[in-house]
């Protein structure tokens, strides 16, 4: 009897999605041959809700190992709205279950980040056979040491910081580089250290703008005519850290900004007298071909997911723990975020190197 396996990619795109899809497909075909049928769900959970899917064949998975983005398309479908019936009067959960049934799926593989995993857990609790695969450049999925897409994004953000050094030095400027990472600062921490940033500001380490300016001033006194500040998009100051997320987000909206980077740049220029500029690489960090590391990781994850399909182990997500690929229960990781802990060795390394954390 043939197995029918559905695959979807949800949330923001990142390098390695196609490599993971390929890893799943090649491993399934190697194991089951003609006794497996793969169904591509288009545009993430949105396609599962609206019934958009297509039958796929081996040719669809050729030549995609190095390809950025996702051949299945993706859309953001917030978990908080999954049980909300909006103006279109669609019961999203019921619609997803219907598509699963209509497509005659034996299981569904969901590639995505934290929101994707929360919805995957919801579907698992609703009785569907679901397996998750951890995708995010933020590296913040609970229960796994690394997610595919992260290392490529580190390479990209590091190159941005590398290139900013020369223009900062040439113009005697302070450069604030905004790195993606709203709730977790892994990407900023890794790329900041790899790129030689002088100041690294993370969501987990609330900053004091006076300390930031003091760090810039110390460098100037030692003869450095520039400073590089790597700012996570979710960085917050010590006063904001005392508020609930919605409260400080509302205050920022009133002030006309969403991230701290422009405010930091303005304050540094005013307090130090040094010309300050902002660089936001933005979605460049999500784009392009995955690194060799991410291609290997994606292949490991994809092939392991195929093994889970073979043994019919569902309600889990793939993870890397202590250099071993394992499966974590969705209910154990859904809704949790892997933040940079205070005891993180890289924070210690940064401090030893004289890097200011704000």
Specify the residue positions occupied by each region the protein language model found:
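A cross-family phosphate/adenosyl-ligand binding-site feature
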Residues: 1-9, 20-104, 115, 237-242, ...
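Short, acidic/small-residue loops that bind anionic groups at enzyme active sites
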Residues: 33, 123-147, 154, 202-208
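Short beta-strand segments
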Residues: 8-9, 40-42, 73, 110-112, ...
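Accessory alpha-helical/coil subdomains and C-terminal extensions
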Residues: 99, 110-112, 120-122, 150-171, ...
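Alpha-helix capping and helix-loop boundary segments enriched in small/acidic/polar residues
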Residues: 12-15, 87, 114, 144-152, ...
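Flexible loop/turn connectors
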Residues: 301-310
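Short Gly/Thr/Asp-enriched flexible loops that form oxyanion-binding sites at enzyme active sites
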Residues: 20-24, 114-128, 188
